[in-house]
UniProtKB/Swiss-Prot annotation:
It is an enzyme of class 3 (hydrolase). This is Dynamin-2. Residues 826-846 have a biased composition (Pro residues). It comes from Mus musculus (Mouse). Expressed in most tissues during embryonic development, including the peripheral nervous system although no expression is evident in skeletal muscle or heart. The gene is Dnm2.
Amino acid sequence: MGNRGMEELIPLVNKLQDAFSSIGQSCHLDLPQIAVVGGQSAGKSSVLENFVGRDFLPRGSGIVTRRPLILQLIFSKTEYAEFLHCKSKKFTDFDEVRQEIEAETDRVTGTNKGISPVPINLRVYSPHVLNLTLIDLPGITKVPVGDQPPDIEYQIKDMILQFISRESSLILAVTPANMDLANSDALKLAKEVDPQGLRTIGVITKLDLMDEGTDARDVLENKLLPLRRGYIGVVNRSQKDIEGKKDIRAALAAERKFFLSHPAYRHMADRMGTPHLQKTLNQQLTNHIRESLPTLRSKLQSQLLSLEKEVEEYKNFRPDDPTRKTKALLQMVQQFGVDFEKRIEGSGDQVDTLELSGGARINRIFHERFPFELVKMEFDEKDLRREISYAIKNIHGVRTGLFTPDLAFEAIVKKQVVKLKEPCLKCVDLVIQELISTVRQCTSKLSSYPRLREETERIVTTYIREREGRTKDQILLLIDIEQSYINTNHEDFIGFANAQQRSTQLNKKRAIPNQGEILVIRRGWLTINNISLMKGGSKEYWFVLTAESLSWYKDEEEKEKKYMLPLDNLKIRDVEKGFMSNKHVFAIFNTEQRNVYKDLRQIELACDSQEDVDSWKASFLRAGVYPEKDQAENEDGAQENTFSMDPQLERQVETIRNLVDSYVAIINKSIRDLMPKTIMHLMINNTKAFIHHELLAYLYSSADQSSLMEESAEQAQRRDDMLRMYHALKEALNIIGDISTSTVSTPVPPPVDDTWLQNTSGHSPTPQRRPVSSVHPPGRPPAVRGPTPGPPLIPMPVGATSSFSAPPIPSRPGPQSVFANNDPFSAPPQIPSRPARIPPGIPPGVPSRRAPAAPSRPTIIRPAEPSLLD
């Protein structure tokens, strides 16, 4: 039953189909199969039933096959069938198989003659079949009948093309012998997707139903309308035989008897019939599978590689292991601690390139957000001067002071130090938010165990909240310490002598390091948001902020400068985000009501995120550009002018202002240094230590271990699906690896002239039927066949004798010396030697003397006569 290599390769494909159909991956593997294509009533169903040896396909009028049927024939000692959608049930009665096919078709398509591309998978085990995999497709029809949809022709054509377009599918084009072959829809569709003819095998049915006196010998010998892989003829049961319950095995025996006894076919009887078709398909499928295996292996390996990382944590899963939950708990807690530390401390392993980690965000809070909050307190110049003047007046009381009181300095400094509490506590809150967010990100890997994840988040968050109180207490203590003693002997403090000589302008710029040099504070892309559409609309530029100016360029190469804006008298204000905009905007304006850029009183700069806006604001503060003051605080402006009338008071205010500015800068520097250290020590490092050393004990004491490690139903299903897919891929690769390299492939037939298929609306050069008559047309020897008007082909001699080694005579249609006294009845019909009837050397341009109405030479056959070629 077929060659040995075939028996190994086809079960391989069947195993692969089952493995991947169960996990929904079959459509991606492009497995080698044979698609059966044919028109309605072409004998397609009979061909399939002859393979199985049983009646199992639905029959009826109109369109019966409305879903593709993937039919896997498997050689087995017992005979039964099973469907993939009800795999546990074995069908031994093939009438039930037919009923199940009809029922499964109706479940998807309904009963209204609709069609569906979703296949039905049927496996038939039988001792009477060879190992084959076929797809039965709906019959080609053109005119809708009854309740069929108007576009039924296009629906069926699209479905057929979907299956036969795949390069890994062989096409079995079924055409009845009593139909003009050039009008075969099956061959036309095959030609569309397989123009080289490498995947198409022709099957001619209903040979026994041809008109009396005609045959399809020229077609079956691949001389008339040739295909690269040729044609195979079969004889199926008639409708009368089916209704009469004629046994298929008896039909196969009758088929063999037909070919052996028919004078036009018995010389090639060993190459005709259903058994030979089975063997031929096995050989072709063997070649096709061997060619597809490298690509198939590559696809499987790529899918396996993509699953490797996801399956890694499931590989050693043992549900029956009593220590499994304990091991899993220890592993999860340990992994959680490692992930938390990596996100906080940073790591070169598996770096996230899409967003900032928790540690990077905390770093921005320490060195951008917190300094920004501190600097915001320094810009309220008028309020500070008013407070200093009030302090000096109140200290002097009714007396007129001659000297600047140092008590006013201490009072103002202590008041400024108290203001540090709010930004410091806000910094702690921001860090806590990032820590809790980091904890939630790390526990996402515990989603397999919902209770464990919930408990871990609760315990760690509770601990962070406990550390929050201690951290805030320590920070408030630091501020109280700064407030308790004003150290005027600090090395960085300017003292009274220097303070009297400082001006406000110099004081503003002393916070900028290396003020004699041009220091670049920040570079980056910003969008100028308020340029009118008439002038080109919003544009993105490369901005460079220095200690003295803000410049923008066309690109980051900084070659083409667009503008340079000095920072004098500039301030920052917030701009409300637009309704349809996803940009975050802030504005720069001049306090003296001058245009900042061209005719713009302010330029609106847009960033992609609020974090970028805060970062740019902090950079502008370093350059001495402060945020705009609220208008509500200017209500006491009239009183401010009262103190400006006294020159002595003005000098005293200026002196204390410089002293306060110097000392507050010292405190800010100290706080900026101590805040990150305090938070790291009391909160972040303690949290890391708690996770590593105490979290496991808290988990054990909080709940039962079994309840903690209870898997979610979704995760269990996901794990099972992934493991099943992973093992199916590995099994498929192992099966492919076991294929013997000694399997021999059959060479591909040489190409033929199949241009007759190009004209889809025309007819064949000559009809495929060859009449057999007792009357000889005039002008030709009766038993000699001339070349057909089709493509001139060299015949394939089957059983030809050596008596035809002499060269032919070009002027004659055939060798005349083979006849005795020109008597065509002097030989019995030894048909196997008849292919030599066409002289191989006749030039293609010699016209045939055949009458136009006769497609081939008539021949009278009498079995009792001696051989014509004796």
